[in-house]
């Protein structure tokens, strides 16, 4: 992993929820989360957009999660409607509160999802939720940037079943 403030913030988030994270001198990251301590990452709000990507994994482990309302970033305002719509189709209920989003799911299942436009964050979030969902999820008009392909390669190496049709911008995930 690269040495950066973004990695440090993400590590802090993972440790907050209960992960044991070790980054070696050769920058290899090893992480285990035997017990999730919390499903809320409110204390780490607005440092980066990673809390949104924690939704799927937290929902699978705890059935509920709470993340902060995320603001913009140096890129500008980035809405989360694509994330919400995709997860809703997979059986997740997301409620907007004053300072947070509260998500709940008891039966996360595969779905046919088509994004209005390719979104890296929404594609990552859908993949991270779909790998442990019941059934098959198809993402049409998915982002296929290198970081998406790297995520898929890592997850497949961990036992996931994800196929990519890069030219067609389609990703199929077998939960």
Q: Which residues fall in each region the model found?
A:
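Structural preference for solvent-exposed beta-strand-turn elements
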Residues: 1-175
